């Protein structure tokens, strides 16, 4: 999708990869060093909750972003192979996102905390639902059984547009999640200007930069001489 931005996709894919590594490292440091670690089962319910931000960021946001960029990262690869990688990465992101949401519910249920009372939780459920619908439609239309070429051609721009919308919604909700958790921690006595607070805020900023890089990489052309219009995914 070349939109006359005057820039190529490649620099933004490189930036996104670097920012993904940084964001993943930062959320792991936060969850393990500052929040005590991760656990599937524990008497310390906070350790169960810690699985949620790790899976949502690394599994849902980062892997989902890599899935979006795969046609830019591998522009000369066999189309069917690239399409399969795109499908698998989005499927992994969807599954890990769903598991991440499960651990948020598990923490709430075992801690006696109400579910689905915040805007973050509402948008989260809505986003994962839309992500699942998008994946199913993409699978049926472009992979198996596959629609007719003219149908693929008509669906493709909407598939891309809706996919970017859902991804941006997921990014926005991740920011809400960081804000909500940090607000809870600070209301419980966490130093507003302490190391952990700064780490959380900087992690959120890195996620914003990562998401912006992904979106620009998706809409910028692989080569500046590319014609305008969406063309990285053939209809066949």
Curated annotation (Swiss-Prot):
A molecular function GO annotation:
metal ion binding
Stretches in topological domain Extracellular = 33-50, 106-122, 175-201
EC number annotated for this UniProt entry: 1.-.-.-
Domain Cytochrome b561 intervals: 15-219
Obligatory cofactor(s): heme b
Which intervals lie on the Cytoplasmic side per UniProt?
1-11, 72-84, 144-153, 223-236
Keyword vocabulary terms for this entry: Electron transport, Heme, Iron, Membrane, Metal-binding, Oxidoreductase, Transmembrane, Transmembrane helix, Transport
Q: Tell me the residue numbers annotated for binding heme b 1.
A: 52, 120
Enumerate the InterPro entries for this protein. Answer: CYB561/CYBRD1-like (IPR043205), Cyt_b561/ferric_Rdtase_TM (IPR006593)
At the top of the EC hierarchy, this enzyme's class is oxidoreductase
The domain of life is Eukaryota
Q: What residue ranges are annotated as transmembrane?
A: 12-32, 51-71, 85-105, 123-143, 154-174, 202-222
Cross-referenced PANTHER family: CYTOCHROME B561-RELATED, TRANSMEMBRANE ASCORBATE FERRIREDUCTASE 1
Protein name (Swiss-Prot/TrEMBL): Ascorbate-specific transmembrane electron transporter 1
């Amino acid at each position: 999708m070349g939109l006359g931005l005057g820039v190529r996709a490649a620099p933004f894919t490189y930036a996104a990869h670097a920012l993904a590594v940084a964001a993943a490292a930062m959320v792991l440091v936060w969850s393990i060093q500052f929040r005590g670690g991760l656990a599937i089962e524990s008497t310390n319910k906070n350790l169960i909750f810690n699985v949620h931000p790790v899976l949502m960021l690394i599994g849902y946001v980062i892997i989902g972003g890599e899935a979006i960029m795969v046609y830019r990262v591998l522009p000369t690869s066999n189309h069917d192979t690239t399409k399969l990688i795109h499908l698998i990465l989005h499927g992994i992101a969807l599954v890990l996102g769903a598991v991440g949401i499960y651990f948020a519910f598990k923490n709430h249920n075992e801690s006696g905390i109400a579910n689905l009372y915040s805007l973050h939780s509402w948008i989260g459920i809505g986003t994962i639902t839309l992500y699942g619908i998008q994946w199913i439609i993409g699978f049926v239309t472009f992979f198996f059984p596959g629609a007719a070429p003219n149908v693929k051609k008509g669906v493709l721009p909407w598939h891309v547009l809706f996919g970017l919308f859902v991804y941006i919604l997921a990014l926005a909700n991740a920011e809400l999640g960081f804000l909500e958790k940090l607000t809870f921690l600070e209301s419980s006595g966490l130093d507003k200007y302490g190391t952990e607070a700064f780490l959380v805020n900087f992690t959120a900023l890195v996620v914003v930069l990562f998401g912006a890089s992904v979106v620009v990489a998706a809409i910028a052309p692989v080569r500046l001489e590319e014609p305008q219009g969406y063309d990285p995914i053939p209809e066949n």
